[in-house]
């Protein structure tokens, strides 16, 4: 973090360097952190603070939110390195909340196949659930549905390769 802080050309970092000492307040420090670092920081938070953050993003517990962050960090890294994500088995699949904790994600518990549990779909479902807490006007979920509908039909590779459940498009999460 020291290296990122010292090399940062962000205006708020320069302001703190000039006006105060080298120690950045936590809100400024988190702006410089990578997603993986934020995930680690989150796991180290006090239970009460972590649960407040989890609730803000629609996660029922600190454990679930920590799992989601680790999974999204993994997905982000795969995508950033231009690796195949489509039908990949996720090494860090997002934890599935207990039935009733997050009703729009209850369908994730109905699946026990490796594709259903560890497929890319589970991460996409978590993203679709979290995004409205960041941007209530998001239409990302609708655009994803359209993108997957446009996927070419092929016996060798289909949308089911990512672990989508039967009739997934009719789920409330995607409407």
Predicted features by range, described:
Residues 1-175:
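Long, contiguous internal "core" modules enriched in hydrophobic/ aromatic residues
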């Amino acid at each position: 973090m020291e290296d990122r802080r010292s090399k940062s050309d962000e205006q708020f970092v320069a302001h703190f360097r000039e006006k105060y000492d080298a120690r950045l307040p936590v809100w400024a420090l988190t702006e410089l952190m990578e997603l993986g670092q934020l995930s680690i920081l989150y796991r180290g938070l006090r239970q009460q603070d972590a649960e407040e953050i989890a609730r803000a993003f629609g996660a029922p517990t600190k454990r679930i939110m920590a799992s989601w962050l680790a999974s999204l960090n993994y997905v982000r890294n795969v995508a950033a390195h231009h690796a195949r994500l489509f039908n990949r088995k996720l090494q860090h699949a997002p934890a599935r909340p207990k039935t009733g904790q997050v009703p729009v994600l209850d369908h994730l518990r109905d699946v026990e196949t490796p594709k259903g549990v560890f497929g890319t779909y589970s991460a996409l479902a978590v993203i679709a659930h979290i995004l409205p807490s960041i941007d209530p006007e998001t239409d990302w979920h609708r655009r994803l549905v359209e993108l997957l509908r446009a996927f070419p039909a092929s016996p060798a590779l289909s949308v089911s390769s990512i672990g989508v459940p039967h009739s997934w498009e009719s789920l409330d999460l995607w409407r």
